[in-house]
Amino acid sequence: MIIMRSRLSLATAILMIGIGLAEPAWAEHFFFSTGNPDGLLGALSRRPSPGKIETETADDFALTETTVISQAVITGIIVPNTLPLASISQVEVELYHVFPLDSDTTRTIHVPTRVNSPADVEIDTATRDPLARTLSFSSTLLNPSFTVANSVVNGINASPNQLTHGEGPQSGEEVAITINFTTPIILPAGHYFFRPEVLVNGGDFLYLSAPRPIVPPGTPFPAGVTDLQAWIRNANLNPDWLRIGTDIIGIIPPATTAPTFNMTFSLAGDTVPDAGTPGQANCHGKTISALARQFRGIHSAALALGASSVNDLQDSVARFCNP
């Protein structure tokens, strides 16, 4: 579905209203946003395709309790800017723990550091893909021409050649991609990285940066949790990651420090305070019971959380309970 609008805030408002109408009064809504694009950077986020290697850009978020994530919005530019919105043909989402979880800490790394990076591998049960019918997406045009001051597209290199200072300005159509998780993502409290990828027929999607530290209308991180900078890798660098600002852009005079970036995204859903504990025998039954109580029935829960069916919600719970 292709939609034309002028501002990301409108898309986000509609997203929140749609969820809110389906929620009972006692359900606590979850919403996180890094805010609006700052025009400083566009970083490649690309599904693999013939002649083009996979490139992943990831930024972090935190949860203070078990949460069902139903929707996400990402903002970027399509290059070249002559492409129609229909050229956005595929979106995939992966989530990562923070290193050293899910990582081989005995191998020799080929980057300056892995501290505070995404893990080597994704949380397999949290991957969502339209080919697996676990997400759907729609695209909204925000600005027919948006320019970023710098970009990272091809210059993603192992140490000691990681410093490129970026690849210069890029212009393209600014778009918001709204992602609906038809199999919602359920996660326990924790610190995670969100990694979307986009396939653009005949072009690329450059994920737009947002201010770091977060400023309004973005939402702050929970007390005691550090907002980490964005990281990137391509298939050649995998399983390592590079810091986009510190490692790749670096210090560009007259600046005396390297920039750091957030990426422009938001997440929406609901907390489930009485959910079960992953790995425990009663996790599935306890979580389903908690959802049924919270939403006055499991069918209502599936509707409120954006699941395409009760079976898909059951699948979400099974993935959560058996990571």
PLM features per residue range, with description:
Residues I2-A11:
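Bacterial N-terminal signal peptides that target proteins for export
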Residues E54, I78, P84-T226:
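Aromatic- and Gly/Pro-enriched, solvent-exposed loop/edge beta-strand patches characteristic
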Residues P213-T271:
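PGST-rich, cysteine-poor low-complexity/disordered linker and tail segments that act as flexible spacers
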Residues T271-P323:
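Soluble extracellular-acting proteins and domains
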